[in-house]
């Protein structure tokens, strides 16, 4: 009994005893737990917050409001992500917790997603024509063999070939292709499409406009026409748009460190 009491007293005396280490450490019995009283203070010791911003402007405003010495911005092209750590390490001798963070993922625009989703996807002439008609606003004013109005007229002409049998395709010197078809009622005719289309489009929502070319492809089998398009180097357009976003941040956010990299 006495020995048990002595052991309990010794345990009580040892509990909470500081140890001689580089990292502040205390010896704590399993029968005890350490409780922080920070929640009862007037304000927290440091900011512990993670937010996701939904626009470039919101990100710029937030970083400018909370940035401190050592704040770091990490840009990840692969994920189209921008991560900010406000209480990042000032240098090797001044580590910090990194508890206050902000993230922004560059969102694709509705138009870009529409063209990307249909990229290299085979369609019949009616489906292809309807897609172009619904997205005629994306046709660039410059750089095309035909104007947007001319392309729309070509697209509408394809609607008349619903029951036609396609025979051949001829490439013309003006940069268009002529599709010859036969029809029981009209006897047949020709419809045209450009070999290549130049788009003027925003890769990111509310971002800058970029031009990207799309090659028009076709296949005729048993009188049926299949059409599709192939975007030319879309990844380069995305990379350029992402780099432009980073440059905007550098222009509008001073005295922070920028790094190309991902948080792991």
Predicted segments with their positions:
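Intrinsically disordered, low-complexity segments used for protein-protein interactions
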Residues: 7-11, 15, 21, 82-84, ...
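Generic structural signal of hydrophobic/aromatic residues within well-ordered alpha-helices
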Residues: 5-10, 59-63, 128, 132, ...
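An N-terminally focused, membrane-permeabilizing/fusogenic/translocator signature enriched
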Residues: 1-93, 256-264
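Short N-terminal edge-element motif at the start of the domain
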Residues: 104, 109-124
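Charged, low-complexity surface segments at secondary-structure and domain boundaries
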Residues: 43-48, 112-118, 137-138, 231
């Amino acid at each position: 009994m006495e020995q048990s009491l002595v052991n309990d007293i010794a345990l009580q005396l040892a509990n909470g005893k500081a140890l001689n280490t580089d990292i502040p450490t205390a010896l704590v019995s399993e029968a005890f737990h350490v409780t922080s009283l920070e929640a009862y203070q007037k304000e927290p010791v440091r900011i512990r917050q993670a937010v996701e911003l939904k626009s470039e402007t919101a990100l710029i405003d937030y970083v400018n409001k909370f940035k401190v010495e050592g704040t770091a911005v990490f840009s990840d092209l692969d994920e189209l992500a921008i991560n900010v750590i406000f209480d990042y390490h000032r240098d090797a001798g001044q580590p910090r917790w990194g508890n206050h963070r902000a993230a922004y993922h560059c969102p694709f625009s509705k138009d870009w997603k529409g063209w990307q989703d249909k990229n290299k996807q085979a369609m019949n002439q009616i489906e292809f024509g309807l897609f172009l008609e619904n997205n005629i606003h994306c046709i660039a004013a410059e750089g095309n063999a035909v104007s947007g109005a001319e392309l729309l007229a070509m697209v509408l002409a394809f609607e008349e070939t619903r029951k036609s049998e396609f025979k051949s395709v001829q490439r013309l010197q003006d940069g268009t292709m002529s599709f010859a078809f036969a029809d029981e009622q009209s006897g047949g005719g020709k419809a045209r499409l450009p070999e290549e289309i130049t788009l003027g489009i925003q890769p990111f929502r509310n971002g800058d406009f970029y031009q990207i070319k799309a090659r028009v492809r076709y296949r005729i089998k048993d009188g049926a026409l299949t059409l599709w398009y192939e975007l030319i180097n879309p990844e380069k357009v995305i990379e350029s748009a992402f780099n432009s976003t980073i440059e905007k941040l550098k222009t509008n956010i001073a005295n922070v460190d920028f790094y190309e990299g991902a948080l792991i």
